[in-house]
Regions:
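Alpha-helix boundary/capping motif
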Residues: 220-222, 229, 235-241
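Short, ordered loop/turn segments at secondary-structure junctions
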Residues: 18, 42, 83-87, 174, ...
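Gly/Ser/Thr-rich beta-alpha loop segments that engage phosphate groups in nucleotides
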Residues: 12, 63, 174-178, 198
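Structured adenosyl-cofactor binding patch, chiefly the S-adenosyl-L-methionine
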Residues: 179-220
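RNA substrate-binding interface of SAM-dependent RNA methyltransferases
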Residues: 44-146
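N-terminal positively charged helical leader segments and presequences
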Residues: 1-45, 94
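Residue-level signal for inorganic ion chemistry
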Residues: 10, 71, 107, 185, ...
Length: 245
């Protein structure tokens, strides 16, 4: 960090332990690869009354990773990788744990980038039934479960958030959520909602909905930072695909 950020004496920095503790400090001395800082204040982040969980379907071209990155920068509290029926990517055997660690690393990097005190929790991979059980548990505890779906009658803008509890947001893969999956989630207590008139990619649908729920749509700087990487990586992916065709 000293080399990459070119930190100098007198600069103010934030140090976090990843569990909500934040130290405000001033750089006192720097050497190659190391620095000494004087801590001026230590605070502990208060857990929010309302938390947000993104159930993200596995997607090709690292679009799911892009969603994890942007959602983390926007403030998501937990991310659940979901093996949807139409997911092209498959997590099996040793690949499952390796892929999950990649999600964890992406979330940790985005946490540092956005100067969050706590990274989001990345759960183990779930299938339809496990996702439905998680939805049922969330609703039973007074939370809210929403499924992004282009044919939904309710609009995301009409959603009223609970005063406390978890808000679970389910995002499908490139091919969309199957009728069987949607029926299972609705039976578990989820509400299908549409974000708007346009259909977004799996990489951006979750973060866009999250920004709306968090009331960040008017904060152009926050949203622009979170989506800058999505636009860049999506463009690179499209170029690569075009080159292979």
């Amino acid at each position: 960090a000293v080399t990459v950020k070119r930190m100098g004496v007198g600069e103010q920095i934030l140090l976090a332990d990843g569990e909500g503790l934040v130290a405000h400090a001033v750089v006192a001395e720097t050497t190659k690869g190391e620095l000494t800082a004087h801590v001026s204040e230590v605070t502990r982040e208060t857990p929010p009354a309302v938390t947000f969980t993104l159930v993200q379907a596995l997607a090709k071209g690292d679009r799911d990773l892009q969603a994890v990155e942007a959602a983390t920068e926007l403030g998501v509290d937990a991310v659940v990788p979901w093996q949807a029926e139409r997911s092209i990517v498959q997590w099996r055997g040793e690949r499952a744990e390796k892929a999950r660690r990649k999600w964890v690393a992406q979330a940790e990097a985005a946490t540092k980038q956005s100067r969050r005190a706590t990274p989001p929790r990345i759960s183990d991979l779930v299938t339809k039934n496990a996702a439905a059980q998680a939805i049922s548990a969330t609703v039973a505890e007074g939370g809210l479960a929403l499924v992004l779906h282009e044919d939904a009658e309710a609009s995301l803008a009409q959603v009223e958030l609970p005063s406390a509890g978890d808000v679970m947001l389910v995002v499908g893969p490139e091919g969309g959520i199957t009728p069987v999956e949607l029926d299972a989630f609705v039976a578990a207590g989820a509400t299908p909602v549409r974000r708007g008139a346009t259909v977004l990619r799996s990489s951006s649908a979750g973060p866009a909905a999250l920004a709306a729920l968090l009331g960040l749509e008017d904060d152009l700087e926050v949203v622009a930072v979170a989506f800058e990487g999505l636009v860049r990586l999506d463009a690179q992916f499209d170029v690569q695909v075009a080159g292979r065709s």
